[in-house]
């Protein structure tokens, strides 16, 4: 099985726990996830199976969206509800306009400082592990450029603010909550997080682990198994002449005289490569004089 399936991760499980369950249910060893969701978070977690693990990075690089709850007045060291409380402020009062202005600081391209309790690595070690082992002095936090493509408040009830956010790879929603609290001066942390989409996967085409087990046993899982090229539709394509397939599959470079069909642009670096019947993989284009050729970069056959 070389497919992609999107799982609705429940709270209380790590992303690796989900991978382990999928391995056990499907009895397949080669399984990988496409972007860590913290144990306290829930939602969409695409899982790659078999040769589809080669495109984990492609899905990881896609935009993601979340529903999040921010709690004003309480700051924690992890920026979420699992951490130690660093500051508690009770006597604050903000208008909805004040809170809207704070959210406006988290819109568009921004420089974001990640939480020190994160899986980002310093010299091969996760920052959260370094902190927990008393080696925080080895860490120098650096801002990262991220893109908050959409952020909107859904409701404000007391010190709880529910909001929707769509953002680029590498964005920490915990940091958004923390930074809004710092802007307002009362502190804040993330008290709930549900990922609603990851690339082309959302709540509608994702299933629970219980459904995965049931559908697999009943042989009705096919509806939720996606081909590898489903997540590669941002790449243009080339269809090869049948007599070029073997040479291409063995690492040979195929020039455009043996393309049956294509829709690539002159500036494309990679394309999807097909035979007349099957998806073969991703190919890398090269140009020499007036000839364009394609050579295998990732094979999926």
Curated annotation (Swiss-Prot):
Alphabetized GO MF terms: RNA binding; tRNA pseudouridine(55) synthase activity
Residues annotated as the enzyme's active site: 38
Keyword Manganese: no
EC number: 5.4.99.25
Keywords of the record: Isomerase, tRNA processing
Root EC class: isomerase
Listed CDD domains: PseudoU_synth_EcTruB (cd02573)
Catalytic activity: uridine(55) in tRNA = pseudouridine(55) in tRNA
BP-aspect Gene Ontology terms: mRNA pseudouridine synthesis; tRNA pseudouridine synthesis
Pfam families assigned: TruB_C_2, TruB_N
Summary of the function given for this chain in its UniProt record: Responsible for synthesis of pseudouridine from uracil-55 in the psi GC loop of transfer RNAs.
UniProt family annotation: Belongs to the pseudouridine synthase TruB family. Type 1 subfamily.
Full protein name: tRNA pseudouridine synthase B
